Curated annotation (Swiss-Prot):
It catalyses: (S)-4-amino-5-oxopentanoate + tRNA(Glu) + NADP(+) = L-glutamyl-tRNA(Glu) + NADPH + H(+). GO terms for biological process: protoporphyrinogen IX biosynthetic process from glutamate. It is an enzyme of class 1 (oxidoreductase). GO terms for molecular function: glutamyl-tRNA reductase activity; NADP binding. Belongs to the glutamyl-tRNA reductase family. Its EC number is 1.2.1.70. The keyword Heme does not apply. This is Glutamyl-tRNA reductase 1. InterPro entries: 4pyrrol_synth_GluRdtase, 4pyrrol_synth_GluRdtase_dimer, 4pyrrol_synth_GluRdtase_N, GluRdtase_dimer_dom_sf, GluRdtase_N_sf, NAD(P)-bd_dom_sf, Shikm_DH/Glu-tRNA_Rdtase. Homodimer. Pfam families: GlutR_dimer (PF00745), GlutR_N (PF05201), Shikimate_DH (PF01488).
Length: 430
């Protein structure tokens, strides 16, 4: 079994195509279920964010599983296969581990080093566990990836060195409304991105911050945390009319802020800066044509964030990821031989027990003390004979290459494959 990643992100596809792949909760669960139901897949989950969709699966073969999983992504986008495939990327086995660690460490994010990916990865793990499609392999992999992501941020300044998506968008808004100090800001949404937006603008001396969300309870909680006020979605048009800056980042699947709403809000000729950080977009793109209105979307920010240089911090995180990948793969290779080693020692124990029974039947009057000494001696002989091969096979398992030393050991000692498979695979790799 090996891990397969099939994905698409801001690095491989335009935002317009990513919008077609946006998933709500039920849609995400259905995709995970569909992947898990594929013929060659035994475990599955999906990382879905505003700028990436990545399917992680434990598979029993490469080519068949790639075709199956890629087809699910193509079908989700509603695109022709030939139009979609060039934007997909595939990572397998060791490469899949390396890719996930880079993603969770923030190296692959649109805003390098951003911390939201940690929560999004945890959400992917939780979703798979809730549905029942995440088993030991993906659980171990994702748990370790989360530890790597936390280590990267604890030991470096990667999350502070690079600008966040919100900060970059606010910097772009200066051309229209100037500094945020004294401005009225409207945040639409109450998820993790909205939380980041609210905390960021609240720290910049704004005159007021208002949080609007479809679910009033979520808006109330977010507003209370940052000293803002909350409003309902029914009040959106009225709130637009008094805002200087709008940051929209909901999970809605349709246009939330229409051209007519913005036109009505700016009828007096005032300037309005709108930052649309949602995928699919919350704001009608044509509002950018209205007088005094500026619109900044994810497409506008992509190149700017890609070119930002976190310098030494990025390099430090890369080194951490390299170390962690090597350690994880080493532990995984050693764990892969454990069932064979356990089965071999179990076979040796069975042989010793059978021979002792044979000795007892042939020498019925054997003294108990002598019998115990013989048993002890035979066990020591068996242990010494097996010690070097089992230690060496663990050492050799650390070496990369195509040779399967566990398979060779099983073949040499004629181990029953069912006995090997019956050994529980360790789940505590660190």
């Amino acid at each position: 079994m090996s891990v397969l990643v099939v994905g698409i992100s801001h690095k491989s596809a335009p935002v317009a195509l990513l919008e077609q792949l946006a998933l709500d909760g039920p849609g995400l669960h259905k995709l995970i279920d569909d992947v898990a139901a594929s013929e060659h897949v035994t475990e599955a989950t999906v990382i879905a964010t505003c700028n990436r969709l990545e399917i992680y699966a434990e598979v029993d073969r490469f080519h068949g599983s790639v075709e199956e999983v890629s087809r699910l992504v193509v079908d989700r986008a509603g695109e022709r296969t030939e139009a979609m495939l060039p934007h997909l990327y595939v990572h397998y086995d060791d490469g899949a581990v390396s890719h996930l660690f880079q993603v969770v460490a923030g190296l692959d994010s649109m805003a390098v080093g951003e911390g939201q990916i940690l929560g999004q990865t945890r959400a992917a793990l939780n979703a798979g566990q809730e549905i029942g499609t995440v088993g030991p392999a993906l659980n171990v992999l994702f748990q370790q990836a989360l530890r790597v992501g936390k280590r990267a941020r604890a030991e470096t300044g990667i999350d502070r060195a690079a600008p966040s998506l919100v900060s970059a968008a606010l910097d772009r808004s200066r051309a229209t409304v100037g500094e945020l100090s004294g401005k009225r800001v409207l945040v639409v949404g109450a998820g993790s991105m909205a939380g980041l937006a609210t905390s960021t603008v609240a720290a910049r001396g704004t005159a007021s911050v208002t949080v609007v969300n479809r679910t009033s309870g979520n808006a109330d909680r977010l507003a209370e945390e940052y000293g803002a006020r909350s409003a309902t979605l029914a009040e959106l048009a009225a709130e637009l009319a008094v805002a200087d800056v709008v940051i929209s980042c909901t999970g809605a699947t349709g246009t939330l802020i229409t051209r007519d709403m913005v036109a009505a809000a700016t009828v007096d000729g005032r300037e309005l800066s709108i930052l649309d950080l949602a995928l699919p977009h919350d704001v009608d793109p044509t509002v950018a044509d209205l007088p005094g209105v500026s619109l900044v979307g994810l497409t506008d920010l992509a190149d700017e964030l890609r070119d930002s240089d976190a310098g030494q911090e990025v390099e430090a995180v890369r080194q951490i990821v390299t170390q962690e990948v090597a350690a994880f793969l080493s532990a995984r290779r050693q764990a892969s031989v454990t069932p064979t080693v356990v089965a071999l020692r179990s076979m040796a124990t069975s042989v010793v027990e059978a021979e002792m029974e044979r000795l007892t039947s042939r020498v019925p009057g054997l003294d108990d003390d002598i019998r115990a000494e013989v048993l002890h001696t035979v066990r020591r002989v068996a242990d010494k004979l097996l010690h070097q091969p089992t230690v060496r096979v663990r050492e050799l398992a650390n070496e990369t290459g195509a040779v399967s030393y566990a398979a060779a050991l099983a073949e040499l000692f004629a181990l029953d494959q069912e006995a090997v498979d019956a050994v529980t695979r360790p789940e505590g790799l660190t």
